[in-house]
Amino acid sequence: MDVLTQCIVGISLVLFGIYGFIAILIYSFEREDKLEAKRRNEIIEYFTSNGFKYNDFSTIFPNDVRDFNIAHTDKKGYSVKNYIAETYGQRDGVDITIVDHTYLESIGRQRGCYEHALCLLRNQEIKIPDFYLRNRIFILDSIKKLFGMKEIIISEDKEFSKKFVLQGQNEEEIRNFFNSSIRQVFILNQKRGCEYESKNNSLMVSKRKYFLFMTAGYLNVKERIELLENSLKLFNSFKS
């Protein structure tokens, strides 16, 4: 094989590799688009048949969540990318909105893109103190406490305080609110990847989907239904 032929073969192999890689990328993007379209259609079918309305993009929701820290709005270190697949309606006298939310988080020069679902529940007749609650991460939270992390420990309920980190400004009001029945509802409905925050008598639930130790995109319709039912069960427990 002469030098010219070797060059032609080499260039052909390189081009084949490049075009093959591009073809794989195009296939991956098309497959992802099809899966996302299927997911949204399933969400539309279920929620609209159960009294909810649907928007591909939310323009109202960002204004409702600006005060919530777990919404990761336009605060320092965060920038909102979009609110999509919005479903909203009313159940048991509670106004409920669920959206898929993508945001960018900047720490120094590093920037990461994250997805989670947000469920906002409101009923003006239900009074809730402002609080934040999440699952305890034992090693990480032990380190945070060494650096001054403050939390509200329910000493009479070791199971609850072992499972959750509870925080808020008005400790006495929060302690009175988190009675044994409400604590038990949280324990029974504990889910991986969930955070809870109350502001202005509204409850927001953030739910992340995980694969092993990494976040894994948006919730499917079954997972969104589960988020709805569990969040509503929690919120209704506040009525008593």
Task: Set out the residue ranges of the language-model regions.
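Transmembrane-cytosolic junction motif
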Residues: 20-46
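Alpha-helix capping and helix-coil boundary motifs
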Residues: 4, 28-32, 220
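Feature marks short, highly hydrophobic, charge-poor N-terminal signal-anchor/signal peptide-like helices
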Residues: 1-14
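Charged, low-complexity intrinsically disordered regions
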Residues: 40-64, 69-240
